Amino acid sequence: MKRVKLTVAYDGTNYCGWQVQPNGLAVQEVLNRCLSEFLGTETEVIGASRTDAGVHALGNVAVFDTDARMPAEKFSYALNTRLPQDIRIQDSCQVPEDFHPRFQETIKTYEYKIYNRQFPDPTKRLYTYFYYYPLDVQKMRQGAGYLIGAVSYTHLRAHETSQDLV
């Protein structure tokens, strides 16, 4: 048995988020289905970070376990030919069996874009927030200063369930 790490990029517009939900299509569900069909056995990915509905990701990390003889580095190619165009595997590689993406020391970067013009641009509507009124950039910079640095958001997470434990 080997553990394969996937670096996943996706446009979350058409998804209810990362994690499988009973009321909508999730990125994790699409990956599970794609892997299961490709490998011929039920396969589930474990993700590093959950995203909400409509949120995009450039490098979310996920792992799955497999007995497949195919080299781990080839999974990105195999999956990308089967995945919808709004989900892509940027990289795949073998990692130690005890590697868990949620418990690795990682840096998460969140990017929010404000499109400040007289009229919205329809090509930017899915990736920016349109704001018509003038922005006070000086106050925005001052406020942003409070966000700089290492911050622990553990107090914001939901209580752990048995699924959260390894």
Spans of features found by a protein language model:
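Catalytic/RNA-binding core of pseudouridine synthases
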Residues: M1-A150
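Conserved small/polar residues in nucleotide/adenosyl-binding loops
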Residues: T154-T161
